[in-house]
Curated annotation (Swiss-Prot):
One of its GO terms (molecular function) is thiamine kinase activity. Gene3D superfamilies: 3.90.1200.10. InterPro entries: Aminoglycoside_PTrfase (IPR002575), Kinase-like_dom_sf (IPR011009), Thiamine_kinase (IPR014093). It holds the Pfam family APH. Pathway: Cofactor biosynthesis; thiamine diphosphate biosynthesis; thiamine phosphate from thiamine: step 1/1. Its EC number is 2.7.1.89. One of its GO terms (biological process) is thiamine diphosphate biosynthetic process. HAMAP family: Thiamine_kinase. Belongs to the thiamine kinase family. This is Thiamine kinase. It comes from the Bacteria. It comes from Escherichia coli O9:H4 (strain HS). It catalyses: thiamine + ATP = thiamine phosphate + ADP + H(+).
């Protein structure tokens, strides 16, 4: 149920107008993108979300609602309400673990997602890389950062191996181990892109786990594993630059020291992989 309004409303107004019988249960602060909170009434639970980035255009939040509206409920929460600065979606019962599931199980989830109809908007990384450079702390901008940005701009993004709907933020904290199988939450970066970009972006523990995930996916997708791994590797510098830039951007927004530590660690990874 989308609801358009140019006037933002408070949490209490949202609940009294649309969910008068529900009451807040708990607040979630997991992840790097910010929190959300849970509401409940007679055993029925919804998650109330807000945009993680206060400076992002409202269209980005609306796209998340549209993505959830077209995804099957077996892999994503069903949305119930959208309006300016608020979205209400199903609560997914299950365990959120601190480590990734078996690579074959995760490959199955991603392959199923990639078989769904496309969302209708492309993920393009270069505009984001440039935005993060422009919006970062000037004291943190280095010659090396600018050099890598120019190098990627000249090289252009890898040509997609297969174009599919992507989640683009797959890590242990965004995976719900439910009774009916794995499901994904936090779809704010979803869009259409290369399947290899999705695989490159998964927050794996080590290269061995990454290779196994790619091999398991390649088996399902009937792609030569070596071919898929080469394409995944082509995306590595783009993904590392994206992560480093996002951490720098969030550092300037929030002043949270964790983002500086994560940015520094990602810059070191970039130097190693060059």
């Amino acid at each position: 149920m989308p609801f358009r309004s140019n006037n933002p409303i408070t949490r209490d107004e949202l609940l009294s107008r649309f969910f008068p019988q529900f009451h807040p249960v708990t607040t979630f602060n997991s992840g790097l993108s910010g929190g959300s909170f849970l509401i409940e009434h007679q055993g029925q639970r919804f998650v109330v979300r807000q945009p993680h980035d206060p400076d992002a255009p409202q269209s980005a939040f609306l796209r998340q609602y549209r993505a959830l509206s077209q995804l099957p409920a077996c892999i994503a929460p069903k949305p119930h309400l959208y309006l300016r600065d608020w979205m209400v979606v199903d609560y997914l019962p299950g365990a959120v673990k601190t480590y990734l599931p078996d690579t074959n199980e995760l490959a199955g989830l991603l392959y199923y997602l990639h078989q769904q109809p496309r969302f209708g908007w492309r993920i393009t990384l270069l505009p984001l890389l440039e935005l993060y450079w422009q919006q970062s702390d000037p004291a943190r901008r280095t010659v090396g950062w600018l050099r890598m940005l120019k190098r990627l701009r000249k090289a252009r993004e890898p040509r997609p191996l297969r174009l599919s709907p992507l989640h683009m933020d797959v890590h242990a904290g965004n995976l719900v181990h439910s009774a009916s199988g794995l499901k994904l939450i936090d779809w704010e970066y979803a869009g259409d892109g290369d399947i290899a970009l999705e695989l490159a972006a998964v927050w794996v523990e080590n290269t061995e786990q990454h290779l196994q995930l790619v091999n398991d996916y390649a088996t399902r997708a009937k792609i030569y594993p070596a071919q898929l791994w080469r394409q995944v590797r082509r995306w590595f510098p783009w993904l590392l630059m994206l992560k480093a830039g996002w951490f720098e951007y969030r550092w300037r927004q929030t002043g949270d020291q964790q983002f500086i530590r994560l940015a520094d660690d990602t810059w070191r990874q970039l130097l190693i992989k060059q």
